[in-house]
């Protein structure tokens, strides 16, 4: 909770990193109001707000980045996976407040700048227009409605945004079910 974050925060806190929709261990989106309150707390305390969009970013949720649907403006956004259609590529975006620390030569890797991956990333970004993102939201709504229409007592809530959806399956399960 926001209260527990405030209670545990010491004077040496400089940033908060959050994954808006937990992708591993169950697909669990955070509440929009909680995320907005956390962003406000970060501004109040002068903490950086870092958003991990490795799984949620690049159109999967129906917007280029999920944070856009939460009504916040992070200081740093990390992204990967979807940016190059499965090829190894990732990156970060920063606001002006943080951009100055990334001077030439301070951010790099011995495995980075693969020309095939960067070409794939460019192709993905060229595809990522508003009609494409609208289709992601429409298809997500269609899937959600179809799953809910099944009406099975074993199927619980359908959660997520866009095409990043999860289904709560109720009842005990074995590896044969």
Where are these regions (language model features)?
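Conserved N-terminal phosphate-binding loop of PLP-dependent enzymes in the Aspartate aminotransferase
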Residues: 1-177
């Amino acid at each position: 909770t926001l209260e527990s974050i405030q209670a545990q925060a010491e004077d040496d806190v400089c940033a908060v990193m959050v994954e808006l929709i937990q992708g591993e261990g169950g697909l669990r989106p955070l509440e929009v109001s909680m995320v907005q309150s956390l962003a406000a707390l970060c501004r109040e305390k002068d903490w950086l707000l870092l958003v991990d969009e490795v799984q949620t970013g690049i159109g999967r949720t129906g917007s280029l980045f999920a944070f856009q649907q939460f009504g916040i403006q992070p200081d740093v956004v990390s992204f990967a996976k979807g940016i190059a259609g499965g090829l190894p590529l990732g990156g970060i975006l920063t606001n002006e407040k943080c951009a100055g620390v990334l001077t030439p030569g301070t951010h790099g890797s011995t495995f980075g700048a693969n020309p095939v991956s960067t070409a794939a990333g460019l192709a993905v970004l060229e595809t990522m227009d508003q009609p494409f993102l609208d289709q992601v939201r429409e298809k997500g709504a269609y899937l959600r409605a179809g799953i809910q229409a099944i009406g099975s007592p074993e199927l619980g809530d359908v959660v997520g945004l866009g095409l990043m959806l999860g289904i709560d399956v109720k009842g005990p399960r074995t590896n044969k079910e």
